[in-house]
From Swiss-Prot:
Membrane topology term: Multi-pass membrane protein
GO MF annotation, one: UDP-N-acetylmuramoyl-L-alanyl-D-glutamyl-meso-2,6-diaminopimelyl-D-alanyl-D-alanine:undecaprenyl-phosphate transferase activity
Species whose genome carries this gene: Burkholderia cenocepacia (strain HI2424)
Name assigned to this protein: Phospho-N-acetylmuramoyl-pentapeptide-transferase
Claim: Manganese is one of the keywords in the record: no
Entry cofactors: Mg(2+)
Length: 389
């Protein structure tokens, strides 16, 4: 919004040229989202408390968590407000990548909000059924996947609908250019061609998988938000490089016109996340809830797809991956042993993984900070793929 205004008035006030610089707008998006979160946080927490949307705590979990019962949840709304305002203020609203990421983020946020609302307001412990939740996630994920298959493959001024119709007329056999290939880290001249169908399938699983992985990680005070901020900031760097014809050529990456604008979104997400951490740090005054976790995970997955860094997301989001695998292995092993021995057995003391470490003697803050450190290391490792190719 401010970019369009600055471009319109630039002839009358040359200092407004500053608003056209991507890095300046990224910094301002961070500050804006951070400021909104810090200022609006107490009001949002009061409103959530008045709505009596207190978090229910599992009685079979760590006993130290029982004191958290009643802490307001659905605080992810605060994050989404910061992201929306900062992105709309400082982003280029003619950029289609901005809008598709916003659509996925807020679409998944609505799913999470409905799930949270049913749990804490209607007192339905199940919330949305797994089938219902995955159905709506799949609807949004598949729409984004089809849209991005033709958005990423061409320049920003080509109509996506025209490309889609060309694919249909080709008998669904039209290929995609090299910039839409699956990029392999550390290999500068080797990529895996996906084709339209491969791109859609991969994108669907990345977006929906990332959303649910972040949601599973959200279980301790401050645990998930800092990894989201770190991974989001790292993806913002990739977006800046891929969107720049100069830097992408120098670093031997395919140039994706318009992708650089995602730096604004990632910066807004980082600022909003840090503001939320102010109130979510131990002992938490508010929890994120599904409304925040599903939305942020979907956002990370979508940005990673646009900048063609799905494998790097898997690396940098190693904590999310480990938490998800711990749940899958725990459930699978329990079912297998129950069928084979007549008694279900556990691989871990409790899943997800962070609860296993708590029950093994780690304090909550130790688990959180150590997971932060691991994520920082993984993000730095992921960023090395920019140069080590």
């Amino acid at each position: 919004m401010l970019l369009a205004l600055a471009q319109w008035l630039q002839g009358d006030a040359s200092f407004l040229r500053l608003f056209t610089y991507l890095t300046f707008r990224a910094v301002m998006a961070t500050i804006t989202a951070l400021g909104i979160g810090l200022v609006c946080g107490p009001w949002v927490i009061r409103k959530l408390t008045q709505m009596k949307v207190g978090q229910a705590v599992r009685k079979d979990g760590p006993q130290t968590h029982l004191v958290k019962s009643g802490t307001p949840t659905m605080g992810g709304v605060l994050i989404l407000i910061g992201i929306a305002v900062a992105t709309l203020l400082w982003g280029d609203l003619t950029n289609r990548f901005i809008w598709i990421v916003m659509l996925v983020t807020f679409g998944f946020g609505v799913i999470g909000w409905v799930d949270d609302y049913r749990k804490v307001v209607h007192k339905d412990p199940r919330g949305m059924s797994s089938r219902e939740k995955y159905f709506w996630q799949s609807v949004i994920g598949l729409f984004a996947a089809v849209y991005l298959a033709f958005s990423v493959s061409e320049a920003n001024n080509v109509r996506v609908f025209d490309l889609f119709m060309a694919w249909v007329r080709s008998g669904l056999s039209m290929g995609l250019p090299a910039r839409a290939d699956l990029m392999l880290p550390f290999l500068k001249s080797i990529s895996y061609p996906l084709g339209v169908w491969g791109f859609i399938v991969l994108t669907y699983f990345v977006i929906v998988g990332a959303s649910n992985a972040v949601n599973l990680t959200d279980g301790l005070d401050g645990l998930v938000i800092m990894p989201v901020v770190l991974v989001g900031a790292s993806l913002g760097v990739f977006a800046y490089v891929m969107g720049s014809a100069v830097y992408s050529k120098y670093l031997l990456f395919p140039h994706i016109p318009g992708a650089g604008e995602l730096l604004i979104f990632c910066s807004a997400m980082g600022g909003a996340g840090l503001a939320f951490l102010w109130y979510n740090t131990h002992p938490a005054q508010v929890f994120m809830g599904d409304v925040g976790a599903l939305a942020l995970g979907g956002a990370l997955g979508t940005v990673a797809v646009i900048v063609r860094q799905e494998i790097v997301l898997f690396i940098m989001g190693g904590i999310f991956v480990a938490e998800t695998l711990s749940v899958m292995l725990q459930v699978s092993w329990f079912k297998y042993t129950k069928k084979r021995y007549g008694e279900g057995r556990r691989l871990l003391k409790m899943a997800p993984l962070h609860h296993h470490f708590e029950l093994s003697g780690w304090k909550e803050t130790q688990v959180v900070v150590r997971f932060w450190i691991i994520t920082l290391m993984l993000c730095l490792f992921g960023l090395t793929t920019l140069k080590l190719r």
